[in-house]
């Protein structure tokens, strides 16, 4: 499966911020664009990566390993 690198970047920034508004600002995109791209990535992977609720956004069990793998690549 070929993943869109833009979607992966959006995932990484959202996983760091855990806030759609701040992540969208960092990425210089509108919040609805970020939301659509994350949902599209979740469909591509057939896994929910984030839980969204009144208490905010957090990584799901499926999203946490992906975030750790990405963090491990930083030098």
Question: Where do the model's predicted regions map?
Answer:
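Acidic-residue sensor for enzyme active/binding pockets
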Residues: 4, 16-17, 31, 42
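The N-cap/first-turn positions of alpha helices
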Residues: 4-7, 31, 56, 63, ...
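Regular, well-ordered alpha-helical segments
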Residues: 13, 25, 39, 43, ...
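A short LG(V/I)-centered, amphipathic sequence patch enriched
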Residues: 42-59, 64
